[in-house]
Regions:
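Rieske [2Fe-2S] iron-sulfur-binding domain
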Residues: 2-104, 108-118
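C-terminal catalytic domain of Rieske-type non-heme iron oxygenases
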Residues: 92, 97-168
């Protein structure tokens, strides 16, 4: 998301979200949902995005989330284009990573990640590159899976090759 128009379509806690670097250099995040009838605004990640257009009725939003045009809505009683905008999510950029909060009342990045930033700082995150995304569907209760992931006592027995590579 380095250049103006770069955008990523993703999900945050099950909510479709578009991250977009505006022509003004500001990185913004919006739900990928039109305010009119909830049609999608972006269909894929990419480069060179200009304005965001709803794929259902053609409502057009600027890169800052303001509604610019709503076809055939000129005569709608009480409707004003200037009253409509996409709800902006709070975004924080750190070391090439992007953090977005759906809840406008969520604590600030600095509060949530207090202490972690200092521990990670020696790692040159800025030089790292995204390689791939893996997804595994596991037929189990998520709490059991997370507990297993966080608990390292089983590593020597179940993953003996990792014992030499990881300080569990």
């Amino acid at each position: 998301l380095a250049e103006a128009g770069d955008h990523v379509l993703t999900e945050v806690a099950g909510t479709p979200v578009v991250l977009l670097r505006g022509a003004d250099g500001v990185l913004r995040a919006f739900p990928n949902v039109c305010r009119h009838r909830a049609g999608p605004l972006v269909l894929c990640s990419g480069k060179g995005a200009g304005n965001l257009r709803c794929r259902y009725h053609g409502w057009l939003y600027g890169q800052d989330g303001r509604l610019l045009a709503a076809p055939d809505m000129q005569g709608a009683a009480g409707f004003r284009v200037s009253d409509v905008r996409l709800p902006a999510l709070r975004v924080h950029e750190w070391e090439g990573l992007v953090f977005a909060a759906l809840d406008e009342h969520a604590p600030a990045f600095e509060q949530v990640y207090a202490g972690i930033v200092e521990r990670i700082r020696p790692v040159d995150l800025g030089s790292m590159q995204f390689l791939r995304r893996d997804r595994w569907d596991v037929d189990c209760n998520w709490k059991v899976y997370v507990d297993n992931f966080l608990e390292g006592y089983h590593v020597p027995m179940v993953h003996p090759a990792l014992v030499q590579a990881v300080d569990y």
